[in-house]
Amino acid sequence: MSPRQFLIPNYPWSRVAQYLRQLGTEEIKPYTIDFCNVTVTYKHTSHNESINVSIWAPKPDDWNRRILALGGGGYAATFDHLYQTTAVGKGFVAIGTDSGHSSGMTSAFDTSWALDADGNSNTHLIEDWGFRTLGEMSVIGKHIVEEYYNRLPDYVYFTGCSGGGRQGLVLAQRYPKAFDGILAAAPAINLETFIPAAYWPTQVMRDFNVYPASCEIEAFTTAAIQRCDALDGDEDGYLDARVLSFRSFEADWQRVFL
């Protein structure tokens, strides 16, 4: 195990604030944060992986005595600095693990790490990503916090969406005492069914050698909005899934496409 630590003063939050505004998730003025950046690198006995746990600890006077572990998305176990910056700005110690392979939004759909040099399934690394390193992240994060602040946190939370939501459910199932609260949003579970389902429309188009033009896709969307927009009592261009009653065979497609 190899820990490294750096004091990061006046880290700019402006780029993160700009990104969150683009997502429409939060409207906050840019500011800077001061924190201690600790990275713990380790591997498992008889294995060659390199696992990194990142801990961003705010100054003692700024700490809210809570840890917030941040999940990733897709096949990336964490999104690195993006949400850690936000968490520290709100007073949390932010922690995350890369599970032994590339992390960040640009790595969300990278699966090259799941195969070994011979093209076989890298079972140990897949298990690292699937569950093992998540519990280890909790243990390492709490230990670093106790060493840095000379006390344990009052509460430890986890939050994640999609792939991060899956991580949250795994933590609740396998490590139920690791966190005091888990927010598992839109969990990407049942991989063996939902991933083939996501690719199925593409496969059907390949089988029939028919690929709808973008204007045709837009026509389907327009027809659905025209039929269902007013059902929720507000014609605003958005559909409420709870009241949808659109049936494709009822649309006048000849009028739509001509």
Residue ranges and their predicted role:
Residues 63-67, 90-93, 151-156, 177-181:
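Loop/turn elements at helix/coil->beta-strand transitions in domains of secreted/extracellular proteins
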Residues 1-65, 81-82, 234-239, 248-257:
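Catalytic-loop region of hydrolases
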Residues 24, 64, 74-150, 196:
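Cap/lid segment of the alpha/beta-hydrolase catalytic domain
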Residues 43-45, 72-76:
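Active-site glycine-rich loops that stabilize anionic/oxyanionic intermediates
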Residues 159-164, 168:
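Gly/Ala-rich beta-loop-alpha elbow adjacent to hydrolase catalytic centers
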Residues 170-172, 177-258:
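A catalytic-pocket lid/entrance helix-loop region that shapes and gates access to the active site
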Residues 147-158, 234, 238-241:
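Surface-exposed patches in mature extracellular/periplasmic domains of secreted proteins
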